[in-house]
Amino acid sequence: YKILFKRAFNDSIATSQKVSLALSQFVRSMVSYQSKFDEGLAHTNDPRRPFSNFTNSENRGKQLFFSPQTNCAQCHTTAAFIGDNSRNNGLDAVLTDLGVGGINNRNNDYGKFKVPSLRNIEVTAPFMHDGRFTTLEQVIEHYNSGVKNNQYLDNRLRQGNRVRRLNLSTSDKVALKDFLLTLTDRTFLTDEKFSSPFN
């Protein structure tokens, strides 16, 4: 690595500050915006309109994702499909993992966890903070019919005092998964600069 440090910093001595700077720059370079979704968005500039490069099922899934019926886009809000806050998504009726609340000791943060990016979700299993789901179908079914009520459940998953049920049909669940797969950036996943330096 001495040669690389010399190229990057004009000095071959590796210090913790230089390693920190190099890692920070590397992480900032990891941008994933060349997916099928991004291609469609570039042509329409509106994620709610049908994309000509999508199948009917992918467009239906996209419509569901951004619809009030599912509210997916209420938590996965940014271009990276990530949330700005931690949320309690009803994994457990009785909280055994207090999440953020276990760290900051605030009751209203019990059971809350960071909302992850959905970019490249096709290759990021297992899912949820504890890895309890191994497939996207399980995740979709959780939000469709498996959300557990607890006193700290995010309001987006409530309908009055009850848990919201999405009541998605089998074809809607398939469509939602098909849409999520359009967020996979194959160029990013195969980019040599992100490959293991030890191979």
Place the predicted regions along the sequence by residue:
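C-terminal capping alpha-helices of c-type cytochrome domains
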Residues: 2-7, 11-35, 122, 132-199
